[in-house]
From Swiss-Prot:
Its main location: cytoplasm. Its EC number is 2.1.1.45. This is Thymidylate synthase. It comes from the Bacteria. DUMP binds at R21, R126, R127, R166, S167, C168, D169, N177, H207, L208, Y209.
Length: 264
């Protein structure tokens, strides 16, 4: 995960001080890309411990089309708590857009099922895309999508994915995002009888919050360790039938966790 540490250093060296929606303040760069060959290991940051339980449960929650935090709470995941209303609702965020994008004539498009069908039946298509950025529903969302748009690509029997993330909290959010989409690529590849290829991450406003500077310097002082390996223990009937216990991370030996405040 040297690419991640290099990005941190780049933001420190080249970032512009900017104000932001949360009022915290950031150092920010615009436009950055990283590529992770998923054959080389599972891209889970090792210079601090990442909470893999939260990453897996959040992705399963997205794939169910759920937008209420009840499922997350049942599984001791609190990463969405700050944005939920008194009933636990978040509005039409990721899960809704992935699984039930509304059309003007009253139908709903299941984008995940659509891309699975494309991967199986038309893998050379240049339209194998999922978007969470629904302009017509942004004002109803508790938080506008940060990881907004992703595309799949098949070559030589391998499945790759590129994500465009319009806004990226490099210290807290990005390790989650990389691991989450890498996990999704593994799941989609298994469902389509493909090998995993690359995960390509592309960032827009890529920033470090001003109250994450000490934590960033601490993390940069640590030497990355070997990447772990993801094991998927079974192949479910569909992408929507995976369970938390289907996944195992082998060989994850990170440095200790580093706490930091969330900008709301």
């Amino acid at each position: 995960m040297k690419q991640y540490l290099e990005l941190m250093q780049k933001v420190l060296d080249e970032g512009t001080q900017k104000n932001d929606r949360t009022g915290t303040g950031t150092l920010s760069i615009f436009g950055h890309q990283m590529r992770f060959n998923l054959q080389d290991g599972f891209p889970l940051v090792t210079t601090k411990r990442c909470h893999l339980r939260s990453i897996i449960h959040e992705l399963l929650w997205f794939l169910q089309g759920d937008t209420n935090i009840a499922y997350l709470h049942e599984n001791n995941v609190t990463i969405w708590d700050e944005w939920a209303d008194e009933n636990g609702d978040l509005g039409p965020v990721y899960g809704k857009q992935w699984r039930a994008w509304p059309t003007p004539d009253g139908r709903h498009i299941d984008q995940i099922t659509t891309v699975l069908n494309q991967l199986k039946n038309d893998p050379d298509s240049r339209r194998i895309i999922v978007s969470a950025w629904n302009v017509g529903e942004l004002d109803k969302m508790a938080l506008a999508p940060c990881h907004a748009f992703f595309q799949f690509y098949v070559a030589d029997g391998k499945l790759s994915c590129q994500l465009y993330q319009r806004s990226c909290d490099v210290f807290l959010g990005l390790p989650f995002n990389i691991a989450s989409y890498a996990l999704l690529v593994h799941m989609m590849a298994q469902q389509c009888d493909l090998e995993v290829g690359d995960f390509v991450w592309t960032g827009g406003d890529t920033h470090l919050y001003s109250n994450h500077m000490d934590q960033t310097h601490l993390q940069l002082s640590r030497e990355p360790r070997p990447l772990p390996k993801l094991i998927i223990k079974r192949k479910p009937e569909s992408i929507f039938d995976y369970r938390f216990e289907d996944f195992e991370i082998e060989g994850y030996a990170p440095h200790p966790g580093i706490k930091a405040p969330v900008a709301i």
